[in-house]
Structures are given as C-alpha cells and as structure tokens.
C-alpha cells in the first residue's frame, strides 16, 4: 500500500501493486498480502512447470492467520480483498488451527482465540509483536510467529508482553513531554504539529505522532535521534491531508532539506539532518497550507444515527464484534442522548460511566478521556460485549461526547 517514488530502484523485479502499469486490482495490500499473493503465483508457476502436481504444493491457506494479523496490524484500508483475507484468517483462528506463536500471544493478552476479532489483532497481538522492533530486535517477534514449539512460543510471547509494557511507559513519558512542548508560551499554533526531543526513543515516535494527531487533529510528525547528525521522524495524518504528497512538496520546494522519505496518505517516515529541524518545521507547515488552502482542521464525526433500544444488547454487540472492521471500513457508530448516573476514572486516564436512556442502564467507557461529563450528554458510541465472571453484558465504548 506504500506508494513508489518517482524513480524506481534498478532491480530485476519489483513487486508492488501501486507501481505504474501494474494491473493487480487490490492496491491496498499490506506487505504480508503482497508476499502471500507472490507465493500463490510462485506455486501456480511451479505447478505449470511440473514441479508440483496440478493440485500439489504447500497448503498456503495454513498461513491465513498470519496474513490476517499482518493486514490488520499494518492498518491498511480494509477493501473487499483485504476483508476477505482477514475473514479467512479469523475463521482459522476461531477453529483453533492457529500458529503456536499466535496462540501464545492470545494467552498473554488474556484473549480467547475462538472468539477472535479484528480488535484482538490490532490492539492486543499487533502491539506486542511490534514492541520488539520498537525497543529491541524485531527477530524476537518473528521467532515467536514462526516457531512450531508451543513452550518456546509461550516463553517468547511473555517476553514480548514485558517489552510491550516497557513500551507503554516510554510512550506515556514522551507523550507528556510533547504535550508540554505544545503548551509552552512560545509554541505558535499552526496547521501542523512537528516535535523533536533529543531524549526520545526512535521506536516510539510513530505512536506519539498518532496520539498527538488524535488530540490536535492536525498532520503530525515526531522526531527522535537516529545517529550522530541525523534525526528520523514518523508521521500520522488526517483524511484531509495526504502526508506523502506534503513531504514530496517540501522536498521539491527545499531540495536539500529532507534526506529521504516514504509513505502514503495517512502515514510516512523521513530522515533529516539534526541541524535542519528548525527549517523543516515551518516548511512542513507551509506545504500543508499550500496543498489544502487551510490552516486549521476539524474532525467530521460520521455516525449511523440512533440505535433502537431493542438492539442495544449483548447479542447484537456479539454479532458486530464477529465482523471485520477497521481502517476504511469502520464499525457502526451510534449517536444517542443519555443521562450520566455515575462516572469515575479508572487507570488514571479512562472514564468509566453508568448511563441511562429511557428504561435502559448501560456501563460505558471512554478510553483516553479523563475529564468529567455533564449530567446530560449526546454520545457517539460503539457496542461491545463485556465478559465478567462468566456473565456477558453489553458495554458502550464512547468515541465522542458532549
């Protein structure tokens, strides 16, 4: 799903559905999808040459769980083809036929493979695998996914879980430092957010950029040291701004400012000389203004309207959770008015609520929100099942309220 540059590498073969002239129809494949289709094509060619029988060769559907995980974790657009890949992988997981490493990761995350859904892949398994590459060596995550030994898989999954806990701590510290820098008296508001700190960890800047983008709703770049004289940044954008196009414009307006960059509409990475950051930040801001004609952005909240009371239950929540939702194919978001009967902070940064609508009472949670709400609210929310002591109930996950 990454877009190639103007000049392609001098190679015998380039496999990228987004390169000019490629007729492969699914342009939103993650890297794992590209290699999966390449393996299918290779097997077909080996069958044609007689290396395998017409229906012989390796059973590649045995890899569908890994393909699903990679597709969701890479946050690619879930078009029809990607949803098919994820659906096949989830079905394999729910049947219990999954790689030992995935089974171990489900265990350390406290999730049940037989009820696997896209949320598990994107928010429970994916971050634990990625944590190794962010803070240490990605080979641990690869080894966990590829081992056939159940005991080794569990040992590695536990190590990945510990690394992920460390990642959360580092990310929280960096996020607080970034917010403090944004709130400094000399921090001029602009169309973008662009931050750098010499003490930040290179592997976590993308997560910090994502958090800042959500908070300020602007294209965001966060940088950390990447060598003696270089800094490397990771960016996250909003639907109104194509991030790679912005960086391409900066590179054309200021040819020596960016040493290298790549990415797509919603995310990108780049490298600068450390001494060039003060010049880059305003150039980035100016490029966004030039491409969009705007200096501020507001999120547009699209909902599916009010949910009839008869459908606000655990059964419907369970049906929704079994579907494939994600980037470009969001889960239903409902909009209703509630009375707030009780509210309290849990984990210091999440708001736990007891809500009332007519004769119905609901438990609800707003992740990452620590401000109290008025007695009456209009809330945009999603349904999810909550399992506690063997009892299944419906919980509302608040996305916006006021």
Model-derived features: where do they sit?
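OB-fold and OB-like beta-barrel modules that bind single-stranded nucleic acids
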Residues: 262, 320, 339, 374-387
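Hydrophobic helix-and-loop "lid/oligomerization" segment in the mid-to-C-terminal part
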Residues: 44-276, 282, 296, 302, ...
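Short gly/pro/ser/thr-enriched loop/turn and capping motifs at secondary-structure boundaries
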Residues: 2-7, 13, 21-23, 227-230, ...
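Beta-strand/loop nucleic-acid-binding surfaces
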Residues: 248, 356-372
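Single-stranded nucleic-acid-binding OB-fold domains
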Residues: 343-347, 367-371, 384-395
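Short alpha-helices
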Residues: 8-51, 60-67, 263
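OB-fold single-stranded nucleic acid-binding module
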Residues: 276-281, 376-402
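Accessory interdomain/linker segments of ATP-dependent helicases and helicase-like nucleic-acid enzymes
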Residues: 298-362
């Amino acid at each position: 799903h990454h877009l190639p540059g103007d000049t392609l590498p001098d190679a015998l073969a380039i496999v990228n559905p987004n390169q000019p002239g490629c007729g492969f129809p699914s342009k939103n494949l993650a890297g794992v999808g590209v290699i999966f289709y390449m393996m299918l094509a290779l097997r077909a060619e080996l069958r044609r040459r007689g290396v395998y029988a017409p229906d012989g060769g390796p059973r590649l559907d045995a890899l569908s769980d890994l393909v699903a995980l990679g597709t969701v974790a890479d946050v690619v657009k879930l078009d029809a083809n990607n949803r098919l890949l994820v659906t096949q992988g989830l079905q394999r997981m729910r049947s219990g036929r999954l790689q030992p490493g995935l089974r171990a990761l489900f265990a350390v995350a406290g999730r049940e493979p037989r009820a696997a859904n896209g949320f598990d892949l994107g928010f429970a398994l994916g971050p634990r695998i990625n944590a190794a590459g962010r803070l240490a060596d990605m080979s641990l995550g690869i080894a966990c996914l590829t081992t056939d030994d159940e005991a080794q898989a569990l040992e590695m999954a536990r190590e990945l879980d510990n690394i992920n806990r460390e990642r959360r701590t580092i990310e929280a510290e960096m996020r607080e430092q970034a917010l403090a820098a944004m709130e400094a008296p000399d921090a001029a508001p602009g169309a973008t957010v662009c931050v750098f700190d010499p003490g930040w960890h290179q592997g976590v800047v993308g997560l910090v950029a994502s958090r800042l983008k959500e908070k300020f709703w602007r294209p965001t770049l966060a940088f950390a040291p990447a060598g003696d004289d270089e800094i490397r940044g990771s960016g996250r954008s909003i639907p109104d701004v194509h991030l790679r196009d912005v960086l391409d414009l900066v590179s054309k307006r200021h040819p020596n400012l960016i040493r290298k960059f790549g990415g797509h509409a919603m995310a990108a990475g780049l490298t600068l000389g450390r001494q060039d950051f003060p010049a880059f930040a305003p150039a980035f801001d100016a490029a966004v203004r030039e491409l969009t004609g705007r200096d501020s952005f507001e999120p547009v909240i699209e909902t599916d309207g009010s949910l009839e009371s008869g459908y606000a239950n655990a059964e419907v929540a369970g049906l929704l959770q079994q579907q494939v939702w994600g980037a470009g194919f969001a889960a239903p978001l409902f909009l209703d008015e509630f009375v707030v009967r009780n509210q309290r902070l849990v984990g210091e940064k999440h708001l736990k609520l007891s809500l009332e609508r007519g004769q119905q009472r609901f438990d609800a949670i707003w992740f990452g929100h620590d401000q109290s709400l008025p007695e009456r609210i209009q809330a945009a929310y999603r349904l999810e099942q909550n399992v506690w002591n063997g009892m299944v109930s419906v919980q509302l996950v608040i996305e916006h309220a006021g």
